[in-house]
Amino acid sequence: MQAIIMAAGRGSRLGNLTDTIPKAFLTAKEHRLIDYNLSLLHENGIDDIKIVTGYKAGLYEDLAKEHAGITCIYNPFYAHCNVLGSFYMAQNELRDEDTVYLHADTLCDPAIFEEMVQGTGDIVMPVDFKTCDKEAMKVITEAGQVVKVSKEIPEMEAEGEFIGMAKLSAKAMPAIKAATRKLMREGCLNSYFEGAIQAVIDEGGYRVPTLSTEKRFWGEVDFEEDYRYVKDNLPDALWQIAERHKND
């Protein structure tokens, strides 16, 4: 199993907190956000890790020198495209095998992560079933399967928020790559990665089960209030895993 971490963006909505570092280098309880994600991957036996970089890429390259199994892939167009563009830059480096997809600035309870990695389905999507705001990556489901994922879903129709990490099966990977290439050829530079997921769902023939977060911790650091939430609520179990793997 391999992993791809999306880490190209600057995080400008965090103000001067990201003037000199990418947001995944912000710390919570002594460890950087990126360290927590790397430790979760190692804890689950995943050591082949690709990080798509952009803003302050040199810091990630230095990080890769300190850890075996990490490869950095630079997206020179990170300031002019969204996440799908970064995935496009990296997809030729990804084998068609089970893959964990995640964002460098998103953390979750270790139990959610483990359940996702062990989950069965072609695209296993952790979802926080709750009332969503306009900016949330919202989902609609049928019989436990995601049928629509988009920020454009009306808030009143949404069942919950996709937390931005997923397990992609070996079967789904070629379809995800093909959908990404198609969207890029169509000039969809501002598309989210979920646009490729939706294309695969629409194609049919793939199981896309949800994994409920069940009110367990997760957090995406986009704004200063998000950062405060993560620092105040980060689970001890996640910190302990980071401690255990800090020298990997």
Language-model regions: role of each:
Residues 24, 69-71, 207-209:
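Conserved beta-strand segments of alpha/beta enzyme cores
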Residues 61, 66-137, 141:
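Conserved beta-loop-beta/alpha segment of the NTase-like Rossmann-fold superfamily
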Residues 1-19, 245-246:
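N-terminal nucleotide-binding beta1-loop-alpha1 segment
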Residues 20-35:
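Short catalytic helix/loop segments, enriched in acidic residues and glycine
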Residues 25, 139-141, 210:
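A structural signal for short hydrophobic beta-strand segments in well-ordered beta-sheet cores
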Residues 2-5, 31-98, 186:
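Conserved N-terminal catalytic core of the sugar/cofactor nucleotidyltransferase
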